Amino acid sequence: HDTIPNWITYTVSWPPTLKNCLDYQWNEVAIPYWQGLVEQARANGVEKFALENFSSMLVWNPETLFRLRDAVGPMVGLNLDPSHLIWMGADPIAAARALGPAIHHCHGKDVRLERGLVNVNGLLETKPVEDVANRAWNYVAVGCGQDLQWWKEFFSVVRMMGYNDWVSLEMEDLTMSVDAGVTSSIAALQQTISQ
């Protein structure tokens, strides 16, 4: 039995066994598990699940979310974290439009692709987050990766798609103090969240 699944989130074109592994993960593990969990949650008054789109998880982008929703229903939605989509090379604004009412929560979290490093090593990164000087990308205070105009458009589109609820600040910028990062991020969010 899998106790700590390692979800396949990259190409399955080679080696051929990866396609079989991915099919197993979805059809034999994930979908049956989530069908049971949604049924149990509904029986206990839970209305929504918001899964964060992180790279090593089963649901890491709109396409994988919709695959799960098709199997288990709209109770499952996305906790839209734009920072993860950015370092995966996706456009969070386009993703928000595609997600529509499947946005169940939203993070205010930014990322910076590090010039000179991302160009050499690409976006996949396994160095610890503490190794900020050598990583291809780093989590940064809101506004230190994408400018404020970008954030205004992001939150505007999220709201147009029907999400008008909490935005959780995740301050994981290790290039500044926690106090400075929180203060800077709150100031950026106050200027950019659609009221």
Show the residue positions of the predicted features:
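Conserved, mostly hydrophobic/aromatic
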Residues: 30, 49, 81, 106, ...
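A general structural motif
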Residues: 44-48, 73-75, 101-103, 160-166
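A short, mixed-charge helix-start or loop-turn motif at secondary-structure junctions
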Residues: 19-23, 136-140, 171
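Gly/Pro-rich active-site loop or hairpin
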Residues: 62-66, 86-163, 179-180
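C-terminal helical cap(s) of enzyme catalytic domains, especially alpha/beta-barrels
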Residues: 178-195
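Active-site beta-loop-alpha junctions enriched in small/polar residues
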Residues: 2, 52-56, 81-85, 109-113, ...
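Active-site acidic/histidine proton-transfer and metal-coordination neighborhood
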Residues: 1-77
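A structural alpha-helix within SAM-dependent methyltransferase catalytic domains
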Residues: 31, 35-42, 66-69, 100, ...
